[in-house]
Amino acid sequence: MKIGLIGSGGMGEGMSCHIMDNNIEVWGYTNDYSKTQEHYEKGHISGCVTNIEYLAYVVHLDSKEYSSTGKTPGVFVLTLPTEAVDEAINELLEHCMSGDIIIHNGDFNFKDFRRRSETLSKLGIQFVDCDTSNDSVQITGSKTTISVCSSIFKSLAPNSKWNEFVTLGALC
């Protein structure tokens, strides 16, 4: 599995280390390429790119055929300040394929989650909110999407159980 990480500040860098420990490739992008390059040189991400378009390209290299071969869809994790999430999603959407998954890791707001997930589901993109705190993870999204990404979530809380909150209505 390979994921694209958008926002590799302190939280993103720490998450990527845990995720990579479970043999998942993590490719990083942030507006400050020198910071992303530094994380790559430390071995905290598998690779780094200079823009979201190339990040999507790299993530899709191994997952283009997932719908017919059972491979994992393109998975993108956002570790951004709340005010930057919608802008990043809009930029990423220009390069997403139907079936891709966007995970927001940050402060959870149900109204924002609902709005984003409804908008994205109309475009064939799945949306998951993942709130991490210390060694616990709370996940909100469709059961199928959470299952596809379970190895990511388990890597974030390896010594404890993680809770999933499956949304009802349009997402199931």
Put a short name on every predicted segment.
Residues M1-Y66, G70-V75, G99, V128-D129, ...:
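NAD(P)+-binding Rossmann beta1-loop-alpha1 motif at the extreme N-terminus of oxidoreductases
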Residues C17-M20, Q37, E53, N90-L93, ...:
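Predominant activation on well-ordered alpha-helical scaffold segments within soluble catalytic domains
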Residues E53, T69-L78, T82-Q138:
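Rossmann-like NAD(P)(H) cofactor-binding subdomain of soluble oxidoreductases
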Residues D129-S136, P158-C172:
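Conserved Rossmann-fold dehydrogenase catalytic segment
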